[in-house]
Amino acid sequence: MTRIIILAAGKGTRMNSDLPKVLVPLHGRPMIKYLMDSVVAAQVDPRPIIIVSPENKEIISQELKNYNVDYAIQEQQLGTGHAVACAQAVLAKESEPIDNIIVLYGDHPFLKSDSIKKFSKLNPETLTIMPTVLPDFNGWHRNFYHWGRIIRGADGEVEKIIEFKDASAEEKLITELNPGFMCFNYDWLFKNIKTLQNDNTQKEYYLTDMVKIAFSEGRKVGTVNIEPQEAMGINSQEELMIAESLLN
């Protein structure tokens, strides 16, 4: 069985909103609802979707009252790895076995149900990621420039994901990018997530460092590519305007 976690931390400050970022309207609807609808349509898991949010759970839960949802609270925003670790207590209450965990982001409204369904059927030994490849960073693709880069070895295998703020000038030229969507083997994830370190410029526990852990074990990291529009996230007023135009 596959469980789904949606990370929903983040404020709407950069979009001139007092709302949590995932509730900022996109064509009149909170942006997270587009993703929620895709998750429901994928029919991956009849059990509640787990939303990881900070202390503003109440306002998010009010908007999502018509969905089957459980909440995990991330009291301190210490990174995406820490956010997923916060969901472990909720998952531990399950009576049925869990095989896989899919991690999605509430500010990515364009992910399709078919992609979620495909992701759920992979059954990785460690993890699978969902990259997108750009032709360049021109036009609306410039909004992807600050995303993490997929680093591959000479054999073409994924070795790690490097976040933009930690990337070298050469690594920033890479156009295979990480939207953040990941599918994990449940046991492997929670065995290894506690070993994450925050030795980076942000001093955060990056979920993306799980790729490096898998590679260090000699494990292959799987990939399922998606188109740039499907991968797009919304973090600024400019990106919100682009997303609005893509929906027209």
Q: Over which residues does each language-model region extend?
A:
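Conserved N-terminal catalytic core of the sugar/cofactor nucleotidyltransferase
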Residues: 30-106, 110-115
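Short, structured coil segments at secondary-structure junctions
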Residues: 19, 64-67, 227
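Conserved alpha/beta core of the MobA/IspD/sugar-nucleotide pyrophosphorylase nucleotidyltransferase superfamily
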Residues: 173-248
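Conserved beta-strand segments of alpha/beta enzyme cores
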Residues: 22, 68-70, 157, 220-222
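Structural beta-sheet core signal
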Residues: 4-6, 50-51, 102-103, 129-130, ...
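Short alpha-helical oligomerization interface
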Residues: 18-25
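N-terminal nucleotide-binding beta1-loop-alpha1 segment
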Residues: 1-17
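Conserved core of the sugar-phosphate nucleotidyltransferase
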Residues: 111-197, 201
